Design a protein with these regions (language model features):
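Generic detector of short, aliphatic-rich beta-strand segments that form the cores of beta-sheets
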Residues: 1-2, 114-117, 198
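Papain-like cysteine protease catalytic cores
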Residues: 3-4, 10-93
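Secreted/processed peptides and extracellular or luminal domains of membrane proteins
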Residues: 12, 179-182
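Deubiquitinase catalytic domains
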Residues: 66-168, 181
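C-terminal recognition-helix end and immediately following basic linker
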Residues: 165-169, 182-201
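Short cysteine-rich clusters marking metal-coordination/redox-active sites
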Residues: 171-176
Length: 201
């Protein structure tokens, strides 16, 4: 499985309990980008929409804010993303789908994971591992309870420095051994040299 499938695998697991949805979810993003050039302009995407749409179909292309927005819209559900490094929480679809299900992800700077809440003894739930909360049915205290647990986990991971600061981390090109700082230098090095194998040190 490709490392850069994490966002798609996390969304697939949260909403479908499947790790086999990445290709399908990538196609959803591809189609959305091509169908709405006003929303998904080159300025918003960082590259021309057609190029971005083709790029996102590749299994080694990562997902981020654009994909979370598109998938929230497509699924008509909320997606809460908890950023370990900053403590920020972005809830995609909260304003558009306030009475929908909400799935939870945690992000460490490089990797998205599904958040699964274990609630043994829940009534009328055969599986006690909960991946979504239904914002239309659940009391606000339960919704807030999920949020508190997710924030607490992100805070704990932050205190343990279980995140990668992609703007400032030290990398070495494993092809030519050049030292680099941050994702931007690595991207520029890859563009000018064709080298794409990096290691953090």
């Amino acid at each position: 499985m490709y490392k850069r499938q994490c966002l798609f695998n996390a969304i697939g697991y949260v909403f479908f309990r499947s790790l086999a949805k990445a290709k399908e979810l990538r196609k959803v993003v591809h189609d959305a980008v091509l169908s709405d050039p006003d929303t998904f302009s080159e300025a918003a995407l960082g590259k021309p929409p057609k190029e971005y749409a083709e790029w996102v179909l590749r299994p080694n292309s990562w997902g981020g804010q654009v994909e979370l927005f598109v998938l929230s819209t497509h699924l008509r559900k909320q997606i809460a993303a908890y950023d370990v490094q900053t403590g920020r929480v972005d809830i995609y679809g909260e304003d558009r789908f306030p009475r929908s299900e909400r799935g939870h992800l945690i992000y460490d700077g490089l990797h998205y994971d599904a958040l699964v809440f274990a609630y043994p003894g829940l009534e009328d739930v055969s599986d006690t591992h909960v991946t979504v909360v239904d914002c239309s049915l659940e009391p606000i205290s339960k919704i807030n309870g999920f949020d508190r647990k997710a924030r607490a986990l992100a805070k704990k991971d932050q205190e343990r420095r279980l995140f990668t600061d992609v703007a400032n981390f030290s990398l070495r090109c494993l092809v030519c051994q050049t030292g680099l700082v941050g994702e931007n230098e690595a991207r520029e090095h890859a563009k000018t040299t064709g080298h794409t194998n990096f290691g953090e040190y």
